[in-house]
């Protein structure tokens, strides 16, 4: 199963990205699961889960922990995520 994470602090963008992902994978036979995070901190606090994601959508401009910082932490735990 393909594991997808969406991390954005604005729900409107989360919903849009989610709909694009659902539309794309809905047309294929690929099984997938999407997890949503509303901050970089919320995403990175679950370090044990960071290793499971195959695709990660990150917002660059987030408060507290921006997308670049979030990506740096993600890479420490999951160098294979895209």
Could you describe each region identified by the protein language model?
Residues 48-51, 73-80:
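Conserved phosphotransfer cores of two-component systems
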Residues 36-55:
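Acidic, metal-coordinating helix/loop segments flanking the phosphotransfer/catalytic sites
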Residues 62:
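Receiver (REC) domain active-site loop signature in two-component systems and cognate sites
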Residues 1-4:
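Extreme N-terminal starter segment of soluble prokaryotic enzymes
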Residues 11-35:
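Two-component/phosphorelay signaling modules centered on CheY-like receiver
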Residues 8:
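Conserved acidic carboxylate
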Residues 39, 65-69:
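Acidic catalytic/metal-coordinating carboxylates
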